[in-house]
Amino acid sequence: MVMMKKMKGSQSFRQRLLLSTLSSTPISIDEIRADETIPGLRPHEVNLLRLLEIVTDDAVVDINETGTRLKYKPGTIVGGKNLVHSCSLSRSIGYYLEPLLLLGLFGKKPLSIRLKGITNDPRDASVDTFRSTTLNIIKRFGVPAEDLELKIEARGVAPNGGGEVLLTVPNIKTLSAVHWVEEGMVKKIRGTTFSTRVTSDFEHSMRFAARGIFNNLLPDVHIFQDHRAGAQAGKSPGYGISLAAETTTGCFISADTTVSCERPDETGELDVEKKERSPAEDTGVEVASWLLQEIEKGGVVDSTHQGLLFLLCALSEQDVSKVRVGTLSPYAVETLRNIKEFLGVKFAIKPDPLTGTVILKCTGSGLINLSRKLS
């Protein structure tokens, strides 16, 4: 019988649930935003619990009346085909994709799930970044490429969403350990601009501005357009850009953002601070510059993917993984703490003063998918 882990506070909520499920460790979390004006779990957190109930069997979720206390007993990860889930509109689909990817790998059956909601927002990684970068990082750990896919069937920006994606994830027996420390040189940049319920002129402006930043540095730059209309454009107007640099050693570094064009008077409940919208050219320049900053930081992944990289290393076979990253992000540091707490895996961390990067080594926990159906 595994003892229930007792925790406090709302931090790392998504990761705690993910690691609790993968390690079959029941958890109780107290004092969830107990002192805030609106206490308890947020809509997207309750929604994530519902999603876990869809992809697992026999999970037990117990939330008190105020939402400030949660008991979670994880079930068996089953996966399954033709699943559908409507995500909360308080976070984008990107919030749900990272845990789903990892859970899907260790399921009883391959996972095929349709997620509905917001596909692109400034807070979470966009669905474009998942396609261009996240999936490529996961393939590095021995996951077969042919069964790992994310299709964007409709776009949806805040506040009303209306987007739809189809995620398919294969089952694996175990993740391979990696020795991944060479960043290589950037050989090409690929990107996507999109627009929904607004003129495609926004896309032209972003592409032109972003290319202007890269053209002096690299000849191989292609930014594709994805203008959506009708049902495929979701329920709110907006536009955005996602960029990914690929290096000579197969690293992918990404940056993206989204601008929602919904007028303040059309939405009663948006508590986001309203600010003057900058021109689309500025958005293109901003994301291109951000991508260059991420490349300059060094490391085999960008700062938004450090946490995922460490999770993959910690979940892999009982062999040594060695990776290089830029300056550790706060989320990455928190991830290392959660990994130690749930999986008992400790990373040796060694700064490399010559490059300003950090090299991390760990022995994987050797998580094996025992429930996988052998074909």
Curated annotation (Swiss-Prot):
Pfam families for the chain: RTC (PF01137), RTC_insert (PF05189)
- Give compartment(s): Nucleus, Nucleolus
Name the CDD domains on file: RNA_Cyclase_Class_I
The UniProt entry's GO CC annotations, sorted and at most eight, read: nucleolus
Query: What is the first-listed, main subcellular location in coarse terms?
Result: nucleus
Q: What is the lineage of its organism?
A: Eukaryota, Viridiplantae, Streptophyta, Embryophyta, Tracheophyta
- Name its species: Arabidopsis thaliana (Mouse-ear cress)
In Swiss-Prot or TrEMBL terms, this protein is called: Probable RNA 3'-terminal phosphate cyclase-like protein
Q: Which InterPro entries match?
A: RNA3'-term_phos_cycl_insert (IPR013791), RNA3'_phos_cyclase_dom (IPR023797), RNA3'_phos_cyclase_dom_sf (IPR037136), RNA3'_term_phos_cyc (IPR000228), RNA3'_term_phos_cyc_type_2 (IPR016443), RNA3'_term_phos_cycl-like_CS (IPR020719), RNA3'P_cycl/enolpyr_Trfase_a/b (IPR013792), RPTC_insert (IPR036553)
- Keywords of the record: Nucleus, Ribosome biogenesis
What does this protein do, in the record's words? Does not have cyclase activity. Plays a role in 40S-ribosomal-subunit biogenesis in the early pre-rRNA processing steps at sites A0, A1 and A2 that are required for proper maturation of the 18S RNA.
Q: Which GO terms describe its molecular function?
A: catalytic activity
